[in-house]
Amino acid sequence: MEEDVINILKSIGEDPTREGLLNTPKRVKKAYEFLTSGYRADITKIVNGAIFEEPTEGMVLVRDIEMYSLCEHHLLPFYGKAHVAYLPNKKIIGISKIPRIVDVFARRLQVQERLTEQIAYAIQEVLDPQGVAVVIKAKHLCMMMRGVEKQNSELFTSCMLGAFKENMVTRSEFLDLIRTGST
């Protein structure tokens, strides 16, 4: 990968041997290894048995999970917040595992639509809840820095499974909570 970065630098008219760029290929390689580490992550190891029997029936919501990813079309970042909820089915998951699941899928080349669904279906698979809801709000640098150059644009995506899809009251409660944060 380092040689590829050197070639990119040359192709845009830069001198990869100048002082400020000498370590750039190594830094870019390290950055991309981190930013794509989701390909090498295993959800089972992430969850690591942190699923607990619990008779609770109320909605569990982790709101404002900071996330960033790379647009698969331009390799430019998009970033924002994910809101993830589930309705337990006699089991709950350790709350830190939800942001970790978000990171697994965000640290891949992505489109936001697929990212949203992958998070929802992963939680559905490991927890088998009555329902899962995921909403992501993000800014895409590929729209802000190039192309249409709309700096204030935001993309919202959602995936509703089970009770969140079938029951409008449940869906409305979730949407109200992510809008206002009130209980």
UniProtKB/Swiss-Prot annotation:
Family recorded in the similarity comment: Belongs to the GTP cyclohydrolase I family.
Which pathway does the database say it acts in?
A: Cofactor biosynthesis; 7,8-dihydroneopterin triphosphate biosynthesis; 7,8-dihydroneopterin triphosphate from GTP: step 1/1
Single GO cellular component annotation?
cytoplasm
What NCBIfam families does the record tag this protein with? folE, PRK09347.1-2, PRK09347.1-3
Q: InterPro entries annotated for this entry?
A: GTP-CH-I_C/QueF, GTP-CH-I_N, GTP_CycHdrlase_I, GTP_CycHdrlase_I_CS, GTP_CycHdrlase_I_dom
Q: Name one GO biological process term.
A: tetrahydrofolate biosynthetic process
Catalytic activity of the protein: GTP + H2O = 7,8-dihydroneopterin 3'-triphosphate + formate + H(+)
Coiled-coil regions in this chain?
none
Tell me which residues bind Zn(2+).
Answer: 71, 74, 142
Q: List, in alphabetical order, the Gene Ontology terms for molecular function in this entry.
A: GTP binding; GTP cyclohydrolase I activity; zinc ion binding
- What quaternary arrangement does the UniProt entry report? Toroid-shaped homodecamer, composed of two pentamers of five dimers.
Protein name, entry field: GTP cyclohydrolase 1
Q: What is its EC number?
A: 3.5.4.16
Q: Give the record's keywords alphabetically.
A: GTP-binding, Hydrolase, Metal-binding, Nucleotide-binding, One-carbon metabolism, Zinc
